[in-house]
């Protein structure tokens, strides 16, 4: 996952530091999200805190660092990760 996003925040495209990086659940766990690769992206801990239980796309589109290109990369990650690890054999 970190390589997919070039060791950068999935939302801001800023290089992540070890001290401030975390994993955001695209669909929050308390909103019926699951702890699987296709539901997770790397981001800054402060962005994860700000997003909280909000819808990812709704929250992200309101941020000053919003990028349609990054949003598409997030959706491409979801599709790739689900194809690789999510399908039952």
Residue ranges and their predicted role:
Residues 38-39, 46-89:
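A detector for short metal-coordination/catalytic motifs
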Residues 11-42, 48-58:
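Histidine-centered nuclease catalytic patch
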Residues 1-6, 33-36:
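Short, flexible, mixed-charge glycine/proline-rich loop motifs
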